[in-house]
């Protein structure tokens, strides 16, 4: 087993670049590792949104996180979407670019393209892996850089798989040279829902086994977020503080991978900036403490 990389003081957690906090982030300049934006929100070449993002880029590293590449769609990539992303990448020069291991597009009955307007899970099959690898390679060639691909919070399951999710993502990274974006809250949400559907007994053990299986050298970024328990389902809604079990799983992850750029994802019911900074500081403490336990 490879030794865990030593903690690096240069690796720090980041938060989302969201409208209510732009002014304070530019004025206060807290010590963040990066800020994250949703790529598609900034595809328009001009206007105030892009201008404010450029100002943010002068103050912080920017991570572009997308939801629209549909890397697993057998119908193919949307060339227009990719070109818009490429222009944004050229303008902003982000520190990372990422999207999801998901599909969203297909051939519509009678012609045209059907779009789900959501992230749907790709089956973990050899055929699906071939499709996604081909698309990841095409995106990386156009952007002239590697991207990171995120594991999905999935509320439906395909009946048949050739492999498990960690094996699928490891092979995707091996074939394409892409990085992996490990969303620990997504893993926890999936495990809780699988437990409620009778597919597993111990969610914590399942997530730890997933993290143990993933290739540590491929992990380019980690996401932490909150979720909502509706009673029947657990929903990955990014609307609350990171839950205690997710923090424990994060400590397990960095115990294997070392210090990895980590995003505190909070997109709904946005709290005061200081709350986000406190969450980011907790992630920093976990990464840089000798035992990996947050202060």
Across the structure, where does each feature detected by a protein language model lie?
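Active-site beta-loop-alpha junctions enriched in small/polar residues
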Residues: 18-20, 38-42, 67-70, 100-102, ...
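Acidic (Asp/Glu)-rich catalytic clusters
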Residues: 24-30, 46-64, 80-95, 137-142, ...
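Active-site acidic/histidine proton-transfer and metal-coordination neighborhood
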Residues: 78-180
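N-terminal pre-domain/capping segments
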Residues: 1-87, 295
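Acidic/histidine-rich catalytic cores of soluble enzymes
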Residues: 140-233
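C-terminal helical cap(s) of enzyme catalytic domains, especially alpha/beta-barrels
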Residues: 273-294
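Gly/Pro-rich active-site loop or hairpin
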Residues: 44-46, 76, 120-129, 190-257
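Hydrophobic faces of well-ordered beta-strands that scaffold small-molecule active sites
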Residues: 11-17, 33-37, 62-65, 95-99, ...
């Amino acid at each position: 087993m490879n030794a865990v990389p030593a903690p690096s003081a240069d690796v720090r957690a980041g938060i989302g670049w969201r409208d209510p906090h732009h002014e304070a982030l530019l004025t206060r300049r807290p010590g963040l590792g990066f800020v994250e934006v949703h790529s598609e929100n900034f595809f328009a070449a001009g206007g105030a949104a892009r201008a404010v993002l450029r100002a943010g880029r002068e103050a912080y590293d920017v991570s572009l996180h997308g939801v629209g590449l549909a890397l697993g769609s057998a119908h193919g990539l949307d060339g227009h979407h990719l070109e818009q992303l490429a222009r944004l990448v050229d303008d902003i020069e982000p520190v990372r670019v990422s999207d999801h291991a998901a599909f969203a597009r297909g051939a519509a009955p009678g012609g045209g393209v059907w779009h789900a307007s959501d992230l749907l899970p790709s089956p973990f099959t050899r055929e699906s892996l071939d499709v996604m690898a081909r698309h990841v390679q095409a995106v990386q060639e156009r952007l002239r850089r590697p991207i990171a691909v995120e594991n999905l919070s999935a509320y439906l399951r395909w009946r048949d798989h050739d492999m498990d999710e960690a094996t699928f993502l490891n092979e995707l990274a091996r074939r394409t040279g892409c990085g992996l974006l490990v969303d620990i809250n997504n893993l926890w949400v999936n495990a809780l829902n699988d437990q409620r559907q009778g597919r597993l007994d111990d969610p914590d053990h399942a997530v730890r086994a997933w993290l143990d299986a993933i290739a540590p050298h491929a992990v380019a970024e980690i996401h932490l977020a909150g979720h909502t328990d509706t009673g029947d389902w657990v929903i990955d809604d990014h609307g609350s503080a990171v839950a205690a079990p997710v923090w424990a799983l994060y400590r397990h992850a960095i115990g294997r991978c070392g210090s990895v750029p980590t995003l505190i994802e909070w997109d709904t019911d946005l709290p005061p900036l200081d709350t986000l900074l406190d969450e980011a500081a907790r992630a920093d403490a976990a990464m840089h403490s000798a035992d990996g336990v947050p202060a």
